[in-house]
Amino acid sequence: MTRSYRGDRRTKETDIELILNLDGKGQGKIATGIGFFDHMLEQIMKHGQLDLELKAVGDIEVDFHHTVEDVGILMGKAIAEALGDKKGIVRYATAFIPMDEALSMVSMDISGRPFLQYGVNYSGEFVGQFEVQLVEEFFRALAFNSGITLHIQTQYGRNNHHIVESIFKAFAKALREAITIDPRIEGVLSTKGSL
């Protein structure tokens, strides 16, 4: 069974194409026109061991917001579609990841009940030209389009780059664990019988 997705999202603000393989080797190519965002998406790809081809063209001369949010929407949809009926997945995962002085926690439940709890304090508004508030917008879009309950909390940190990168790496590690198929799980991991 191949757990993959190929799709696109086209609006007046963005044009995005995506190919995702959940059971990959952490390979692919990402080009959104936003250097720091590409670097963070590469963390998800590499540390989540996902194969990801993503090309986005957006109105970044206006703002990065539309591109970042729409990539989150399409990635969330891709994860949901690639997971299919969710049979056999571990479902839950929590990861703590440090990056130098920063430590972040991501906990998730692939439940079909989208939610984002986001508790992050930054030392400023930007990493380079990238507004750090867009990190929350990205993960909200991803959570609500994937059906994932997602909790993100930074324990501490001073450097915005380190804080953001520890979040993306923690998300990647938690996602990798939660989507893993455990042969001991018959059907879906729920007393209701569905997710």
UniProtKB/Swiss-Prot annotation:
Catalytic function, reaction form: D-erythro-1-(imidazol-4-yl)glycerol 3-phosphate = 3-(imidazol-4-yl)-2-oxopropyl phosphate + H2O
Pathway named in the protein's UniProt entry: Amino-acid biosynthesis; L-histidine biosynthesis; L-histidine from 5-phospho-alpha-D-ribose 1-diphosphate: step 6/9
GO biological process: L-histidine biosynthetic process
Keywords: Amino-acid biosynthesis, Cytoplasm, Histidine biosynthesis, Lyase
Subcellular location: Cytoplasm
Source domain of life: Bacteria
Main location per the UniProt record: cytoplasm
Protein name in UniProt: Imidazoleglycerol-phosphate dehydratase
Name of the gene: hisB
